[in-house]
């Protein structure tokens, strides 16, 4: 048995960041992880491995689509799937550097202030639940992670399948679907709703679907999946179209079930502790991430909010500061979201639909990458930047980007929103030329007297 100021259960982005910050603030800290490796889903079977695949296949796309346009001629590129798949222990070093105790094994909470790992029970003044999430799946579909897979299985396929059906047109489905489409698979995306990327700006969603269709992905929207049948090395996905209840089926070598994720809290003993839970399985936490059990906190995918690694990291740092007697800060209005397709999509703040529902008067500044010299020079001029600002005050309320390096460009607008900046503030800021980021300034100018290169 050991005594700690804080024990964090879960070593993913929220948990390990929380542990490091707690230690930096002078708290004796331990972090429990049972998966055998720190970093959680993001580092091991999620964000980082998928971005390695997305980058590799983006480069392949550039070779096939744009090299000849640039005057680069030569032998055709061949795909070595095994080498691509293998390019995927820095956190343990950070733990040692910051004097965080790493407890290997699955953790549970037998009583307030106690964490059991294996046969040992440790005590802590504060416990943080940072156990993340798992794929939610669909009723009636058996996941084997071989031919019917979640994102975990999709990142470790032995070979590129000839055909793939992706169930779900959210971030995970579109990213991995586009990877395999660029590698030569015939990819069909089946989505229950009538549009892809639920919750995203409608104009961006339509533009992304149009571009991905040109890249070879097929879309079946408004389709309710009924089940997956396995026979003779093939999977048959059965679905009905919601508009007329007609029945249909698609065969595929691999089926990727990308219908979302759910909090992973089983085995913690929360029910016996009397921890309040929400109807969808999240731990109920207040504005300081505290549960109804004294000394017990929860962050990341275990609580409400977008299931994003960077949201969990922010909460991890913030709750560490709360425990240390400081003020933890997370601005939930300024949490960006990114889809790492080609082109990338990024968003922060309000959408037009949300502002209309609120009845808030707003103005739109939009600029196409067709007017951006850098984007035109490298044949990546598809897409646009859209900035939404308050009609009266000009304060930036949201932004939506589809185009090259959108996931990096969005942060300029995040910083502006964090400081309560206006669109004019961005418009008055000199941007280096030629850069993609000039499109942000042009969109800000479009909120006022007009963009220059439109």
UniProtKB/Swiss-Prot annotation:
* Principal cellular location given in the protein's record: cytoplasm
Q: Tell me which residues bind FAD.
A: 33-42, 51, 107, 301, 309
Cofactor (UniProt): FAD
Keywords for this protein: Cytoplasm, Disulfide bond, FAD, Flavoprotein, NAD, Oxidoreductase, Redox-active center
Q: Which InterPro entries match?
A: Class-I_Pyr_Nuc-Dis_Oxidored, FAD/NAD-bd_sf, FAD/NAD-binding_dom, FAD/NAD-linked_Rdtase_dimer_sf, Lipoamide_DH, Pyr_nuc-diS_OxRdtase, Pyr_nucl-diS_OxRdtase_dimer, Pyr_OxRdtase_I_AS
What does the record note about the cofactor? Answer: Binds 1 FAD per subunit.
| Disulfide bridge positions per record | 42-47
GO BP annotations of the record are:
2-oxoglutarate metabolic process
Q: Does Transferase appear among the keywords?
A: no
Q: Where does NAD(+) bind?
A: 168-172, 191, 225, 258-261
Q: Name the domain of life.
A: Bacteria
Q: Name the GO cellular-component terms.
A: cytoplasm
Q: Which reaction does it catalyse?
A: N(6)-[(R)-dihydrolipoyl]-L-lysyl-[protein] + NAD(+) = N(6)-[(R)-lipoyl]-L-lysyl-[protein] + NADH + H(+)
- Listed EC numbers: 1.8.1.4
- The top EC class is oxidoreductase
The compartments listed are: Cytoplasm
- GO function term, MF aspect, one: dihydrolipoyl dehydrogenase (NADH) activity
The catalytic site is made up of 433
Q: What else is known?
A: The active site is a redox-active disulfide bond.
Function summary: Lipoamide dehydrogenase is a component of the alpha-ketoacid dehydrogenase complexes.
Protein family: Belongs to the class-I pyridine nucleotide-disulfide oxidoreductase family.
How does this protein assemble?
Answer: Homodimer.
- Which protein, by its recorded name, is this? Dihydrolipoyl dehydrogenase
Species of origin: Rhodobacter capsulatus (Rhodopseudomonas capsulata)
């Amino acid at each position: 048995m050991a005594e700690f100021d804080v024990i964090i259960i879960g070593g993913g982005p929220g948990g390990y960041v929380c542990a490091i910050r707690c230690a930096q603030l002078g708290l004796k800290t331990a972090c429990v992880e049972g998966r055998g490796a720190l970093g959680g889903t993001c580092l091991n079977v999620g964000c980082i491995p998928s971005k390695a695949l997305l980058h590799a296949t983006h480069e392949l796309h550039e070779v096939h689509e744009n090299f000849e346009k640039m005057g680069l001629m030569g032998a055709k590129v061949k795909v070595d799937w095994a080498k691509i798949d293998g390019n995927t222990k820095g956190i343990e070093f950070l733990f040692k550097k910051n004097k965080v105790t790493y407890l290997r094994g699955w953790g549970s909470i037998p009583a307030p202030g106690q964490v059991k790992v294996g046969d040992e029970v440790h005590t802590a003044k504060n416990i943080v639940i940072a156990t993340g999430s798992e794929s939610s799946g669909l009723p009636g579909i058996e996941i084997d992670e071989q031919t019917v897979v979640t994102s975990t299985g999709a990142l470790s396929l032995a070979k590129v399948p000839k055909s793939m059906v992706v169930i779900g047109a959210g971030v995970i489905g579109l990213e991995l679907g586009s990877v395999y489409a660029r590698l030569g698979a015939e990819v069909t995306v089946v989505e229950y709703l009538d549009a892809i990327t639920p919750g995203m700006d409608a104009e961006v969603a339509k533009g992304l679907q149009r571009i991905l269709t040109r890249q070879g992905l097929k879309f079946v929207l408004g389709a309710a999946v009924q089940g997956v049948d396995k026979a003779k090395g093939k999977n048959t996905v059965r679905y009905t179209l919601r508009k007329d209840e007609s029945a249909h089926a698609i065969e595929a070598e691999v089926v990727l079930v990308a219908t979302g994720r759910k909090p992973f809290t089983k085995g913690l003993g929360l029910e016996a502790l009397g921890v309040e839970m929400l109807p969808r399985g999240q731990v109920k936490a207040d504005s300081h991430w505290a549960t109804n059990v004294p000394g017990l906190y929860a962050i990341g995918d275990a609580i409400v909010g977008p299931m994003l690694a960077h949201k969990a990291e922010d909460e991890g740092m913030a709750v560490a500061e709360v425990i240390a007697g400081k003020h933890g800060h997370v601005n939930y209005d300024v949490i960006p979201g990114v889809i790492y397709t080609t082109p990338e999509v990024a968003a922060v703040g309000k959408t037009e639909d949300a502002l209309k529902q609120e009845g808030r008067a707003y103005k739109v500044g939009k600029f196409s990458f067709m007017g951006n010299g850098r984007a035109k020079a490298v044949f990546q001029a598809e897409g646009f930047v859209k900035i939404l600002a308050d009609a009266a005050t000009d304060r930036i309320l949201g932004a939506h980007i589809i185009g090259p390096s959108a996931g990096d460009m969005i942060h300029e607008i995040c910083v502006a929103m964090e400081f309560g900046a206006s669109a004019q503030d961005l418009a008055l800021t000199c941007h280096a030329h030629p850069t993609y980021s000039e499109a942000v300034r042009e969109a800000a100018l479009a909120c006022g007297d007009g963009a220059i290169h439109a």
